[in-house]
Amino acid sequence: MDLYQFILIYKEVIMAGSTYSRQEEARYTLQLNKMLDALPRFLVEYFNSLEFTKQPRTKIAYAYDLDTFFDFLVQNNRSPLYGMDKAFLRLSDLDKVTSEDISDFLRYCKAYDNNGKIVTNSDSAIKRKLCSVRGMYKYFYRMDKIKSNPSTQVDMPVIHEHNIVRLEANEVAELLDNVESGAKLTKHQAKVQKKLAVRDLALLTLLLGTGIRVSECVGLDITDVDFDNDRIRIIRKGGAESFVYFGNEVREALIDYANERKDKIPLKGHENAFFLSRQNKRLG
């Protein structure tokens, strides 16, 4: 496969076709509707207002954040909504929540116990959660459906920016080409690379085609890869479960590796790992 072909593949994976985009949007819409069934009824109006301004994946992220927010409010014994049923909260209940309650929520998000699992969030993740809460309050306040907007009184976490180095399309194509061909390697490196080429191509294609984090990629279990629905199940940095859909190019690369993976014998404790190292352990 030459460089030109790889560039075409990259564009298809990143930009996606209109048909795939519609399918992806439908899947995310179904997921959002399922989440809204367990959230306060008034949130349906808010998410309807986002229909033509936010991408489906963004709305899913907002729903996760607000789900965590309302879980905190009904489970925290200092909250004015403590002990109430999350799904049956009324819009008027938002007026009972103070800026101190929201600050408590952000502090809680730093690290909390979720059914025996410790969930942590970075400052950027906490900032996103506050943005989600602010967006909800801003909408209902603007529509004169609540009396105040306490979220504006809560300071945003300070995020230290890092320079992001991005690859151009031709650089990505060359990278994938080198992975497949083993170009620019020593004889020893080429020998090792030949054994891992299918895995490495699958790993890189998945990363580039979905935008997931490296940690999410290497953390995949065999059962997390769903070829029936062309999606993977990942656990986000904040501990939230998410499904990410992939296109045909990613699917083909993953199937090639999955077939090769069947012949490997993982070390004890690594049987569930999808991506294996040379030592047949989970990557990482």
Residue ranges: model-predicted function:
Residues 2-284:
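Conserved catalytic core of the tyrosine transesterase superfamily
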